[in-house]
Amino acid sequence: MKLQEKNPDVFKNDQSRRLSNEYLAKFCRDVPVESSESIRADSELLPHTDDVYRASGLNELAQTDPELAVQLALDLISRSKSGGAIEMAMDFLHQKNVNVGLGHENFSGGDAHRSLLRAQEIAAQMVSCDYSRLCGPDSLRAWVECVQPGVCQPGVSMQLIWQRSNSPQIYEAAVAIANQLRAMRRQP
């Protein structure tokens, strides 16, 4: 029996990886060095870079004041306009096993906690994508992240990756949690 007959996904992932490599090579070739340097310089002037700095220090802060670190992480999730800060804050809360109080109603049973954490992680990414242009069709983030689940194809987006690499229950819960986060963020 051939390897392809045993596991056809191996070859699907190879094709996905090849498509991703082709896209990334073209992307990197088409971006002038000056452009990426000016983007980096401009990003340092953006007001939300403080949030990224604060989010990157959550683990250090937790060593001296764990309650303040958790409060800061929750604040970043509910108020920051930095996608990176939102994702880092959610990751921190998960590392510390902090209950963020979103999505529990969507899961029960033995795998409930792990599924809930995954749905919350995806929800944070969805909200993060609201503040960047990195998640749409043919975006750099999508082409980088599509390799692992093997879904690289022209027009790939984070939405497609989330749908295809998670169970319908996790994906639907993530959408619901992301909507809860968005509603929470709209409140003054």
Enumerate the language-model features and the residues they cover.
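Short helix-capping/linker turns of helical repeat alpha-solenoids
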Residues: 1-101, 131-142
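Short, flexible coil/linker elements and helix-boundary hinge sites characteristic
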Residues: 7-8, 65, 97, 128, ...
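Exposed acidic/polar residues on beta-strands and adjacent loops within beta-sheet cores, strongest
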Residues: 87, 96, 118, 187-188
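Mature extracytoplasmic/lumenal regions of exported proteins
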Residues: 95-156
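Terminal, low-structured helical/coil segments at or just beyond the last alpha-helical repeat
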Residues: 134-188
